[in-house]
């Protein structure tokens, strides 16, 4: 039996989520990432995310200032200003690892990607918990905090090493217009470019 059959209300909400993001052509939202591992203090970063289908993303960080992640549809570029280094990796090698935030690219299909899906009220929102169907992914559990109109406010990812990454989103705008140049990465003068090794 599908996990969806057990909770019709949650299933309906998740279909609303899928339609919201899968139908949008572009997206702009403020984001905050918080990474926690073991007994260490959480590490937080924040900024603005701009996205346009197919496969274009720009994560422009205000904290740490100057950090930039750009996906041009083929490669993912990450600039770390404190090291003046650019990491470049093919998109196909990075997309699976970030499957819990695949909704940003309009590729979220809960029933296909997740199992043991449950939903419970949290204030006026719904907290949806799930596990990946594939055992080959670097995370063991994910939680989505979803508003009544299908907007994802938070995504909590528990990785296999028990580290936790929480993405929070605010001031979401659907279908804004963007200049093409936002999604073309230009290597800063003097920066070292490190390319991921191909398997």
Role assignments for model-derived ranges:
Residues 3-5, 10:
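Boundary at the C-terminal end of the N-terminal hydrophobic targeting segment
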Residues 39, 82-84, 161:
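Solvent-exposed strand-loop boundary residues in beta-sheet-rich modules
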Residues 101-117:
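Anionic-ligand binding region
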